[in-house]
């Protein structure tokens, strides 16, 4: 494992200095699905890329999709991606204890089996305790756009995209050399500093940003009050360099990311009777992420284009429980270190068979590694050492056919054949369709009927298969015989737009069925009082519901979105709601830019209570409403520079927002808090040619 890790990190360091990939800049008309100029590799606001791995109009998508643009991200001003995603319809982010930086679970339409990619590469670590997404370490300043695709995406999206796909794209430079700087502060000991340089022309573009974000947390519990040791700080470094080649018909690009995040864990657990929680002064977690994406994309002819991509994602997750005088065992210490690596080599080739038919063929090679060890020291148990490692290899081939019938009926279908060294061979078909018609006798109005169906699989994480815990109070056993989860899902919906898309109403129904669902089973040994458990394929689950959304954008300076999602989820073994899933969720956000100087937004999120497990007597959190207000005001503007004042207020009404609950304690998110600061941008004047 160490040999593979050293090779991967060395390759990542080399790739950092090599330029990478561009997404095609297309006409947004429904009839044009081909790659076009690689000037900056941008995808337009009304286009989507991740659905077929090439840019196409959102109007043609047979699935339910949302696009969060750089403009939307900047308007919200939220530094953490998980908070931005929580404003999106049918997406729910559950923080494990309510404090920024704590482990988070992202669910879409009730399931946490969602795939997250950054620049096309999987961003979920193999050391997670369940397949899914942990977005708490991703900061938003370096993200250009976020694409949210609901429903099974196992064909083009690949493994672990059964519940949906969230695709993030890194910012790219354009225009003359520019410098951005911002400095912000707020209550709860919050500070945020950022510096970025960017620029680009038809030949070369570049972007590099450094962001440091820190907060004291603000979490509280019902039995301990405000948690004192709850700090979180995160350093992100991002570099994106692209070079056009072959008469601007090709693009070579490298995107590098580094993140170092520390989260203090202020809640400890007593090591002797009476067992319970206490204010821990020195426990913490430390997380490192390295990601590198190197790609080459080429429009060889008007009818054929392709891309080749290599991706590396390496994570080190460390947790430290340090000795103190409160726990009941003054020498008790537990140190856990897990290193995990994933490498991908992928390619997709798109053939324009006819003006109305685009055929895509792709291949993906993926290998994963995990290497973990723990050290547990106790007064009565002595020193207990534990180590584990494992790896898998997977090869995929897939085909996807996109048919356009007279710019009104759009049909997509295909399948992926996957072979995993541990889980065997399986096929995941997907199909979708969209029918777009002018509304009868109503100028500027369109009616869109959409539907999608698919099968997908979720591979167990390497931690679920190989990870072990061997401490004085708990033993978690490896289960190398775990099977992949299987899912089948379908949805239908209708979208009605008016006034040339200025007003849009969307309503849909979704239905999903899982089998071989992975759960955790265990028991307490009556002789030793040690809890013993492991991950097993025990459950089946079903999820169904409906979602509605209204989007109103009467003017470029005003945009409002409101959504409602009802989710009925059930563990068919216990006939109980799935954990962490709110039955009712209401969200709304308004962007208002009355002039060039002022930019304001307001957001609201209301969720019903959530069960913490599938047990009949499971604890349940309370309903909550969270309101946010923010904006940016331009103070000074010159020919080449601007200075702005920005600020945001969170949990405006100081609600007790319960994020997690046990039999003895309830964990609450921070009360009302704010952040404000200055943003400065300067563009280097271009030299004028002498006459």
For each predicted feature, which ranges?
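Surface-exposed extracellular loop regions of Gram-negative outer-membrane beta-barrel proteins
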Residues: 262, 267-273, 376, 421-427, ...
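Transmembrane beta-barrel wall of Gram-negative outer-membrane proteins
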Residues: 185-214, 224-264, 284-305, 353-359
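Short acidic/polar hinge/loop motifs at secondary-structure boundaries
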Residues: 105, 122-150
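Extracytoplasmic beta-strand/coil segments of soluble accessory domains associated
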Residues: 57, 82-122
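A beta-strand signature from Gram-negative outer-membrane beta-barrel systems
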Residues: 137-180
